[in-house]
A protein has these predicted regions:
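Extracellular glycan-recognition surfaces and repeat-rich motifs
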Residues: 45-75
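Extracellular beta-strand elements of beta-rich domains used
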Residues: 40, 237-239
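Short tryptophan-centered beta-strand motifs in secreted/extracellular beta-sheet-rich domains
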Residues: 40, 100-102, 186-193, 198-200
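Extracellular carbohydrate-recognition regions
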Residues: 19-53
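Secretory/extracellular carbohydrate-interaction modules
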Residues: 70-159
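Beta-strand-rich interaction surfaces with strong enrichment in secreted/lumenal proteins
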Residues: 25-26, 86-92, 175-181, 224
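Short, aromatic/His-centered strand-loop micro-motif at the edge of beta-sheets
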Residues: 149-188
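Short, solvent-exposed beta-strand-to-loop segments that form ligand-recognition rims
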Residues: 203-222
Length: 247
């Protein structure tokens, strides 16, 4: 019975993978000037780093993320409610088209992510623009600006009666490709963003691709690294300005 179930799951996964759009084999971005790099070996963190959501620590030449806001706590005794949220650390590096390369390691964490935000943009919750997320079983790209974080769609997530309508609005705004990402092992993540397209590679292999309008947001004012669960690590981050690669 277990063998039959395994074969069914394998067949289902293969069928889903076959329906996904092809990922470009070649880079979609051409690197230009290097905007930022950090190997986390300095005694003092670079000034561009800042706290967003606890908890991150510079530890043994790495950036360690641990989700400590891991449960919803209702308001009580004059204290505001606390909503569970991934740990997030921000990098003040303005970009439009870019290549972000960073080594990641999931040591129990459910995911690690690279996100682009524009806090001055008011059309999406907290100025979220787009996101690349790596889990042990898949790589996801999300157009947040025109997808799940767009103000009206974000509000719909709080109303079960709007579930079907929200699902329709989210079509084409995010995609997940299956992957096998080993925990406790370093992986090289590269996120290319050019125009309204994002391409992700993992350990040099194409891992995900999405073309969606929100990705083309012209003023991505910051990059944020995220970790869900406990613990995730980042190292050797580099950020380049970029332009479309030659066809």
């Amino acid at each position: 019975m277990r063998t039959i179930l395994a074969l069914i799951l394998l067949g289902t996964t293969a069928a889903l993978a076959a329906e996904l759009p092809a990922i470009p084999n070649a880079p979609i971005a051409k690197k230009k000037e290097l905007l930022f790099s950090d190997d986390f070996e300095a005694a003092t963190p670079a000034k561009q780093w800042h706290k967003v959501v606890p908890t991150f620590a510079f530890e043994k030449g790495m950036l360690k993320g641990t989700q400590t806001r891991d449960q919803n706590i209702p308001a009580a005794e004059g204290k505001p409610a606390v909503t569970a949220h991934a740990a997030v650390h921000g990098l003040e590096i303005p970009t439009k088209d870019s290549v972000v390369e960073v080594r990641i390691r999931l040591d129990g964490a459910t995911f690690a992510s690279v996100e682009f935000d524009d806090r001055k943009y008011t059309g999406a919750h907290y100025g979220h623009i787009c996101l690349a997320q790596v889990r042990t079983n898949g790589v996801t790209i999300i157009d947040q600006r025109d997808g799940n974080m767009r103000n009206d769609i974000y509000e719909m997530s709080k109303d079960p009666a709007k579930k079907a309508e929200r699902a329709q609005l989210l079509k084409g705004r995010q995609i997940t490709y299956p992957a096998k990402v080993e925990s406790g092992v370093w992986h090289t993540l590269v996120v290319e963003t050019v125009g309204d397209a994002m391409r992700v590679t993992l350990d040099g292999k194409p891992a995900a691709y999405l073309k969606s309008s929100g990705i083309g947001h012209a003023t991505k004012s910051k990059i944020e690294l995220g970790v869900g669960g406990k613990d995730g690590y980042f190292d050797d981050i580099k950020v380049w300005n970029a332009e479309p690669a030659a066809p």
